[in-house]
Swiss-Prot record:
Family listed: Belongs to the PRA-CH family.
Residues involved in Zn(2+) binding: C81, C97, C104
EC class: hydrolase
Record EC number: 3.5.4.19
Reactions performed catalytically: 1-(5-phospho-beta-D-ribosyl)-5'-AMP + H2O = 1-(5-phospho-beta-D-ribosyl)-5-[(5-phospho-beta-D-ribosylamino)methylideneamino]imidazole-4-carboxamide
Details of cofactor binding: Binds 1 Mg(2+) ion per subunit.
Pathway terms, separated by semicolons: Amino-acid biosynthesis; L-histidine biosynthesis; L-histidine from 5-phospho-alpha-D-ribose 1-diphosphate: step 3/9
UniProt name for this protein: Phosphoribosyl-AMP cyclohydrolase
Pfam families in UniProt: PRA-CH (PF01502)
Any Gene Ontology CC annotation: cytoplasm
Domain of life: Bacteria
UniProt keyword list: Amino-acid biosynthesis, Cytoplasm, Histidine biosynthesis, Hydrolase, Magnesium, Metal-binding, Zinc
Length: 114
């Protein structure tokens, strides 16, 4: 599977050929997680509407929820103004974080409204 050249030409990748992907829950607006993608992961996501990412540690693709059942159905994919990050607007089934929490950003609040 290959990424549409019109999309690929707009992406800015790091030295490893990767760019960041932010998953946001469609119903709440919550930022759920941040992961890495390459062209193939983005192409698979666009084709299947399943959040597909690239694991730097395992050096392989993974589909969110493939083993846990905590799937992401992708409604929208947006490219940021710099071309180095994509936003996936998803319906999250179950926990988004590998720790079992709804979002990866709900445990350590460094600053909040008083």
């Amino acid at each position: 599977m290959s990424l549409d050249p019109a999309i690929a030409s707009r992406l800015k990748r790091n030295e490893a050929g990767l760019f960041s992907a932010v998953a946001q829950e469609r119903s709440t607006g919550d930022v759920l997680m941040v992961a890495w993608m390459d062209d193939e992961a983005l192409a698979r996501t666009l084709d299947t509407r399943k959040g597909t990412y690239y694991s730097r540690s395992r050096q392989q693709y993974w589909v969110k929820g493939e083993t846990s059942g905590h799937t992401q159905y992708v409604h929208e994919v947006r490219l940021d103004c710099d071309g180095d990050t994509v936003l996936l607007v998803v319906d999250q089934e179950g926990a988004a974080c590998h720790t079992g929490t709804h979002t990866c950003f709900d445990t350590d609040v460094l600053l909040a409204v008083e």
